[in-house]
Amino acid sequence: MLFGGHCPGGIKKALDNAHAFGMDAVQLFVQSPRAWRFPEHDPGDLKAFRKRREELGIQAVAVHALYLLNLASPKKDFYEKSVTTLRSTMDAACAIGAEAVVFHVGSHLGDGFEPALERVAPALAEALERCSDTTWLCMENTAGTGGTIGRSLEELAALYEALDRHPRLGVCLDSCHLFASGYDVTDRGELDKTLAQLDDLIGLDRLRCLHVNDSKMPLGSNRDRHDNIGEGLMGEGLGVFLAHPKLKGLPAYLEVPGTDGHGPDAEQTKKLRELYARATKASPAMPTSGRAGSARASVGNDRSTRSKSAGR
């Protein structure tokens, strides 16, 4: 398991923040999360990111797409801005050598899933055309609020099939979202069933990363409210999800409020490691700085060789 979190600072500072927090992996934005305007990144900054990553031994990098994106929107202007921004995000992620771009599909705004699917599929196809050999485009499951797409594994599978099982279309599972949408991943038996369903519908080889968050809201509430490690309703049960053997080796990114309300930090990273240690009855996993090459191969190439796309 690689322990990381969503860190501030963008391309210039996120790596150093992650390192200071004792993380093995980092998730970041490559633009302001609150604005549509996409910056023109200096090629020197993109190159410097790759070099700094090697220096710090950060083993996995994910870029989170803009929260404003709505690839399912029936509103033409909003939809077109979303498609353009996702393309630009993919370009930047490939340039810095990120293993994944994680995105929220969006909401059909009451228009229904099937009409939305007809909009989402070509948008994803455009983004995937820009995908490098090492960067995955990862659909994130949702808590199921309103008309959001991705509330169930079946909805993610429908997108996967609509894209003809594209070899670089992956999945990011968020523990809080799973719990809120009715998947009790704090129970080993239920988690086994969930992962078996994912394997059957899409393939576990397509699961590229995790968001590990506790939940302020109860099971099946369809409300997306992340909580700090050990402070929410999932509690110690979050360790069941974190330590499942079929998730071994994946980057686990925190997206929690943080000790001081400013997001993932050193204290939350420590609690995540300790929870994993208790769940696996082992000593707390320590930062593995300096082993970036081997870990990157484990996260990327080793898992991709197990792809089921040819046989499905």
Question: Which residue ranges define each predicted feature?
Answer:
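C-terminal helical cap(s) of enzyme catalytic domains, especially alpha/beta-barrels
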Residues: 262-279
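Acidic (Asp/Glu)-rich catalytic clusters
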Residues: 16-23, 41-62, 89-97, 126-134, ...
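Conserved, mostly hydrophobic/aromatic
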Residues: 18, 64, 82, 93, ...
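Active-site beta-loop-alpha junctions enriched in small/polar residues
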Residues: 6-10, 31-33, 66-68, 106-108, ...
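Active-site acidic/histidine proton-transfer and metal-coordination neighborhood
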Residues: 71-170
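Gly/Pro-rich active-site loop or hairpin
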Residues: 114, 149-157, 179-249, 257, ...
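Non-cysteine beta-strand/loop elements that form the S-adenosyl-L-methionine
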Residues: 24-29, 59-63, 169-175, 204-216
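N-terminal pre-domain/capping segments
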Residues: 1-65, 69-88, 278-291, 301-304, ...
